[in-house]
């Protein structure tokens, strides 16, 4: 299809869309403690609402990018932003009514925004064919995954502290509506050269399989309170539906993902690395570090309205600054090499946090947040997203970015479930927070190991893969 919009217009729309998604993912971070109090519930329950959002985002990410290949990516992304706004309104009403159930419903609908970033990267690749320019702009867009210089976290903390947490959701809704208009009128429509019918039966099998596995993981995270009969039943269901999905993909003329692609290291090694990375660090930076900063017994004792200035803001700002540079470095030294250096740096940031968190001063948390922002948000995050694009086959460009987005959201959801469960099982306080951080570090170490299994991109020189 002919391109009539400028790259600047396309970038503007895509940045607004990514920011709208990021608000749903991180704007609530400094407000989680306040939400627990306003809704008269537990930290575990609030953490579960976060898990629900990321689980829904993971499930939608499994198939929406591929659907965009067929019906048009602009049309799909616009619809996603509209539905996200609806979910935000429902979540805001939960704050007005004090209903935790309504919050769960709203957060589930908001999860439709899950594959926003991969869709934007695919649309950007269509608009910017030059690899070097694309790499730099990709770094800018992907860095938004950490927030725009922490403005989202600052606003979230300030709004929650002064107007209640429902005001955070009203703000999200407004930005999502703006994003819908921007995408509709500032970008061009694009599809694959020969659109094919969607494999809806295969999609159903895959969503049920992954959904069952996610619910099982969330149940396991309850540790001694877990219902193990439910866990066993869900694991069996996940296995059965994945086998049905595998058979369907081998029998249908137009599979969602061919068996060959599913079994390649380009797919499973990348997805495993993404899940391990996100599980290891996401809840730490977006929940546990702000919790340490606000703790009055062993932490810095900061208020909800200023905690973001010391943690989430520098974390996001460092990631935003590093993103374009990381994209440039990837083109010179290779995505995989830069990814590994980033993971090592993220491990160092967690090690510093482990040894300094007891009685931690605000400046220590600031240092940790900056280092994690440079290494994870600005480097690892960019490399994992970039690999999802460069490892994708030309005949199915939406499948791997979509599955990778699902892996990002899956890992984020598991992160809140697992790390908060570890923290709770150890009694909270200093020991609980330390146990969660150690668990995260172990998971990051595993991610570093699996990163060596990711292959070079087909048709790419070694330095660019």
Where in the sequence are the language-model features?
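Paired small-residue
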Residues: 87-90, 98-110, 363-371
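Conserved MFS/SLC helix-loop-helix module at the cytosolic interface between two early adjacent transmembrane helices
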Residues: 59-98
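Cytoplasmic helix-loop-helix junction between adjacent transmembrane helices
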Residues: 109-143
């Amino acid at each position: 299809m002919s391109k009539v919009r400028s790259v600047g217009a396309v970038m503007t729309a895509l940045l607004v869309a990514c920011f709208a998604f990021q608000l749903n993912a991180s704007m609530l971070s400094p407000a989680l403690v306040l939400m627990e109090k306003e809704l008269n519930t537990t930290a575990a329950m609030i953490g579960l609402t976060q898990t629900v959002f990321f689980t829904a985002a993971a499930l939608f990410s499994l198939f929406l990018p591929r659907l965009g290949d067929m019906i048009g990516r602009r049309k799909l992304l616009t619809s996603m932003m509209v539905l996200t706004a609806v979910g935000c309104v429902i979540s805001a009403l939960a704050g007005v009514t004090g209903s935790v159930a309504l919050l769960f419903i709203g957060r589930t609908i908001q999860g439709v925004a899950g594959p926003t970033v991969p869709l934007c990267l695919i649309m950007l690749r269509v608009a910017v064919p030059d690899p070097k320019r694309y790499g730099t702009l990709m770094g800018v867009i992907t860095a938004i995954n950490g927030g725009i210089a922490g403005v989202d976290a600052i606003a979230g903390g300030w709004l929650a502290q002064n107007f209640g947490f429902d005001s955070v959701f009203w703000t999200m809704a407004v930005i999502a509506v703006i994003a819908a208009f921007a995408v509709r009128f500032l970008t061009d429509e694009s599809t694959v050269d020969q659109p094919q019918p969607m494999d809806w039966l295969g999609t159903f099998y895959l969503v049920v399989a992954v959904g069952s596995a996610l619910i099982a993981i969330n149940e396991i995270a309850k540790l001694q309170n877990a219902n193990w009969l439910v866990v066993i039943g869900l694991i069996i269901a996940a296995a059965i539906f994945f086998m049905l999905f595998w058979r369907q993909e081998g029998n249908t003329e137009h599979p969602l993902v061919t068996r060959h692609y599913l079994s390649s290291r380009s797919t499973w090694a990348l997805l495993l690395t993404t899940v391990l990375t996100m599980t290891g660090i996401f809840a730490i930076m977006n929940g546990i570090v702000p919790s340490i900063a606000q703790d009055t017994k062993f932490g810095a004792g900061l208020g909800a309205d200023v905690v973001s200035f010391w943690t989430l803001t520098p974390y996001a700002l460092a990631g935003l600054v590093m993103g374009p540079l990381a994209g440039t470095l990837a083109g010179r030294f290779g995505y995989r090499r830069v990814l590994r250096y980033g993971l090592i740096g993220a491990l160092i940031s967690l090690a510093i946090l482990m040894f300094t968190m007891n009685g931690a001063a605000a400046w220590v948390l600031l240092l940790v947040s900056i280092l994690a922002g440079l290494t994870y948000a600005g480097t690892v995050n960019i490399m994992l997203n970039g690999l999802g694009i460069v490892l994708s086959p030309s005949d199915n460009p939406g499948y791997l970015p979509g599955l990778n987005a699902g892996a990002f959201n899956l890992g984020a959801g598991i992160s809140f479930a697992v790390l908060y469960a570890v923290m709770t099982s150890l009694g909270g306080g200093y020991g609980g927070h330390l146990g969660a951080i150690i668990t995260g570090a172990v998971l990051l170490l595993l991610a570093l190991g699996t990163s060596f299994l990711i292959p070079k991109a087909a048709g790419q020189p070694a330095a660019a893969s």
